[in-house]
From Swiss-Prot:
Annotated Gene Ontology cellular component terms: cytoplasm
Leading EC class: ligase
Organism name: Pyrococcus abyssi (strain GE5 / Orsay)
Name listed for the protein in its UniProt record: Glutamyl-tRNA(Gln) amidotransferase subunit E
Family classification: Belongs to the GatB/GatE family. GatE subfamily.
The organism's place on the tree of life at top rank: Archaea
Length: 633
């Protein structure tokens, strides 16, 4: 299923995409009976250093090793309500939480997967400080799931139940501060096979999985509760893991940009090979060019030299004109070099972008002369403490050698504009070993049977039912379900509220107030009470907006209190008639002249007085009757 506006022929390029979706479950923590909530309250802190250990295969994971080399100390903040000894790594884990396991099984069945007979927890090595223990506990709950799409079926080989990491509060040069409230929140991890061959197909699969998760009503909502990772590759390229895709609509854009990046990196590789350069031609030789910049106008370099730092350069044979080549909109090969060097220095300078940043052409020429560069050769400069500068340039050398080979396998971070940046090497397989503190857990057959027979309705099926059963507009039904207002909607309908009115108030009115007031303060109980007043004939439907506005500002009040305080309780028919007669008398000349043509004018002026206190339909009937009496007389 090709789309005419495709930027690339993805089939020809051999595009392969796999998804990995993580979503927090709304239960207690996975291995401790404490609430899974976030809090800014800090009652204690402690610190740790973490070191990589060998897996059961006797190997050390490269990503863990790179993290260890940063030499950081990790500080942990916590409070006694949301953190216990389990998540301070001072006590063995308990559990796993029964409710979290049941929700995971629900999700497995909704995704056509087969639950395992026994759950075995493993330890995944993570030493970036986000887990106090230095590992994350994870277990396979189900296998062999499937999502059908217009492009073909996509497999779900594993569904795992694991614990979320601590949340980062502050990152310093040699210290990182984490808060422990998020550590241990149950996290469902759903991985697909790389059978996605079109960017839009990836979006369809992610939406279906998201719908299955939301159907349980047991997943958390809000920023940071869902994380979507992509694995992307093309023929001749490499598998790239892209972390932290937040929005569904960004998935196709990020995939397209990654395809573009890999294609451009392959073009750069081909050009370098054409120029005859090999990885071994890039030597780890550092040139001290500090003296060239003694009187520089570059503020960055001058500041470093003043503090006793140095300006070091490396030679990149045959790279001139390629470091500045764009590989994604606004990003160049030089940006890739800078991303690698970032762990040691804020930035780098390279020949393709100079003169610039206060660096003159004369200074550039002197560096070219000092390094004895040909017209095809390039240089990269770093201004920093000598050891930091050397480490940064080593990273550039490593990345430049990789550019000659093609596309390096790595983990990258999704950026808001759809581009990506380097995070770390792609994790190896040497990061898992068995969890010895948690015994295997057998899933009883009767529990599986009970869950399978009581699966929730999938969101799309619910939308179709609302359209058919309640005669709702499709977009209204879709929004009800997407905003997770469906349960409240069905409750209101069961109370006797017309489906169209309930949906309109929940979607149109409440969403419309979002820019004016903190509408999140209006609870389901507030909404139920307001509708009860309406059903009792105490308020008109026009009063809902005013009542919800006031409740958003003052959530401690009840809907009944607001209706009475604001004078929104319904006027009697006699009172409405009296107000209409007054308005007609005030405009009698117009009424006599226009007769029924004055209907709009009188209605407008009456509604200005009684809006929210009288039913518009009733007002219209009385106005029509009164005008007919006058016209007939």
């Amino acid at each position: 299923m090709m789309v005419m506006t495709d930027k690339f022929n993805y089939e020809e390029l051999g595009l392969k995409v796999g998804l990995e979706i993580h979503r927090q479950l709304d239960t207690k923590k996975l291995f401790s009976p404490v609430p899974s909530e976030l809090s800014d309250k800090v009652e204690f802190t402690f610190q740790r250093r973490l070191r990589p250990t060998m897996s059961e295969l006797g190997e050390i994971d490269p990503a863990a090793l790179e993290e260890f080399k940063k030499g950081r100390v990790y500080v942990y903040e916590g409070n006694y309500e949301l953190t216990d000894l389990v998540y301070m790594d001072e006590e063995p884990p308990r559990g796993p939480d029964r409710e979290a396991l049941e929700v995971a099984l629900q999700i497995a069945y909704l995704l056509n997967a087969k639950p395992v007979d026994e759950v075995y927890y493993m330890r995944k090595i993570v030493i970036d400080g986000s887990n106090v223990s230095g590992f994350q506990r994870t277990a396979i709950i189900a296998t062999d799931g499937k999502v059908e799409t217009p492009w073909g079926a996509v497999g779900i080989p594993t569904i795992c139940l694991e614990e979320d990491a601590a949340r980062i509060i502050e990152r310093k040069d040699k210290e990182v501060i984490y808060r422990l409230d998020r550590l241990g929140i149950p996290l469902i991890e759903i991985s697909t096979t790389p059978d996605i061959h079109h960017p839009e197909q990836a979006k369809v699969v992610a939406k279906f999985i998201g719908d299955a998760l939301r159907a349980t009503k047991k997943v958390k909502r809000g920023l940071g509760t869902i994380r979507q990772d992509l694995n992307v590759s093309i023929k001749g390229g490499a598998r790239i893991e892209i972390k932290g895709v937040q929005e569904l609509d960004m998935i196709p854009i990020i995939i397209e940009r990654e395809v573009e990046r890999q294609l451009n990196l392959l073009k750069i590789r081909d050009e370098l090979r054409k120029r005859g350069v090999k990885p071994k031609d890039i030597k780890e030789e550092f040139y001290d060019v500090t003296d060239i910049f003694e009187n520089t106008k570059s503020k960055i370099i001058a500041r470093v030299i003043k503090k006793g730092g140095k300006v070091l350069a490396i030679k990149l044979p045959k790279f001139r004109g390629l470091i500045g080549r764009e590989i994604q909109p606004g990003r160049r090969l030089g940006t890739e070099f800078a991303d690698r060097a970032k762990k040691y220095v804020p930035g780098i300078f390279h020949i393709d972008e100079l003169p610039n940043y206060g660096i003159s052409q004369e200074e550039v020429n002197k560096v070219i002369e000092r390094l004895n560069l040909s017209e095809e050769d390039a240089f990269v400069l770093v201004a920093a403490e000598e050891e930091k500068a050397k480490n940064a340039l080593r990273e550039v050398i490593k990345r430049a050698r990789e550019a000659i080979e093609g596309v390096p396998e790595e983990t990258r971070r999704a950026l808001p504009d759809g581009n990506t940046e380097y995070m770390r090497p792609l994790p190896g397989k040497a990061r898992m070993y068995p969890e010895t503190d948690i015994p295997p857990l057998r899933i009883p057959d009767d529990l599986k049977k009970k869950i399978k027979e009581n699966l929730p309705e999938l969101p799309q099926a619910k939308v179709e039912r609302y359209v058919k059963e309640y005669k709702l507009d499709r977009s209204l039904a879709q929004t009800l379900v997407d905003d997770e207002r469906d349960e409240l909607f069905e409750e209101l309908v069961s109370m006797g509220v017309k489906p169209s009115l309930a949906a309109s108030i929940l979607v149109v009115v409440l969403k419309g107030l979002r820019k004016e007031v903190p509408i999140e303060n209006v609870t389901d109980e507030h909404i139920r009470e307001a509708f009860q007043l309406y059903l009792e004939g105490k308020i008109a439907k026009e009063a809902f907006e005013e009542i919800f506005k006031e409740l958003a500002r003052n959530p401690s009040k009840s809907a009944r209190e607001v209706a009475e305080e604001k004078g929104l309780t319904l006027l009697s028919e006699e009172e409405v008639t009296r107000i209409i007669e007054e308005v007609i008398q005030q405009n009698i000349e117009v009424v006599k002249a226009k007769g029924m043509g004055a209907m709009g004018l009188i209605m407008g002026r009456v509604m200005a007085k009684v809006r929210g206190k009288a039913d518009g339909k009733l007002v219209s009937q009385i106005v029509r009757r009164k005008l007919q009496e006058i016209s007939g007389g």
